[in-house]
Amino acid sequence: MKKHILIGCFLTLFLNCKEVNKQYHLEDSYVKALNENRKIRAKNRVKYLELTGLFKLDSTTNSFGKAASNQFVLSIKNLVPRIGSIDLSKNELRFNAVKDIKVTNTFGEEIQTIALHIDANGNSAQLFHKQIKWQVITRSGELYLRVWDSKNPAIQAFKGFKSYEINNEFIFDAEFSYFETKRIETVESKLGIPDVTDFIGQLQFRYKGKAFSLDVGSGGFVMVGDLTSGETTYGGGRYMYIELPKTNGSVTLDFNYLYNPPCAYSEFTTCLYPPRQNQLDFRLKAGERLEETL
């Protein structure tokens, strides 16, 4: 990211280099790279826009389909009344298809009944019927049925979000330090129940004479809340990634790369919210806004 930015920094008696944010001069190559990142982000949103159902498995027999008599009702055009059910017992989680309903696994093999094994990530294998697919996921120790529809009207209806103008005030030279051991922390989630996530290190930067820090997750993942949250930006905060150094050291912290989490455009997601220590007490006028593109 740094190679796209020319840094001019003039030291004064009261300001150090890391705070003179407006001395970042943005080249055309920087703008091009940022816009390309946003295009890729828009393409990746399709998998969330396909989501059409999220249901907690809290019964022994959990039937699903279009009919109102199902435990879980799917509002999908031309869907069969009932696809099948996910049955819970003390020893097993099993999907049973309705007779004469074609259901396949990831290998394209037709199945009538199958045990659903939960993997290390808390997910079962995916199953398919026409344009829909589903799997069981785990959140906060609870099992949920998640359903996708590749023809979901939401895919075409969603036009994207507007962003703030590219703002060099919110590009910082920050210091990143790895924690001695990975920290596991409980955070709030879209489901309304706490969930756990891990943090591997911390960013430190200065803005208008004040020191700030942000805890960073695996892969450089950062959840951020600020005083625009719930006003011009999504109330549950925004996400971004940083390029992690191999060892403790300087990194570029560019808030122009902030983006809305999936919960901002799909009700069937399970986003995590920023922890308390990642709530910034200033208005971060950079990155994606909540207003949708017309």
Q: For each predicted feature, which ranges?
A:
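Sec-dependent signal peptide recognition
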Residues: K2-G8
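N-terminal beta-hairpin/loop module of FHA
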Residues: A33-K77, V224-T228
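Extended, aromatic/histidine-rich regions of cofactor-dependent oxidoreductases associated
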Residues: K159-G160, S250-T252, N256-L294
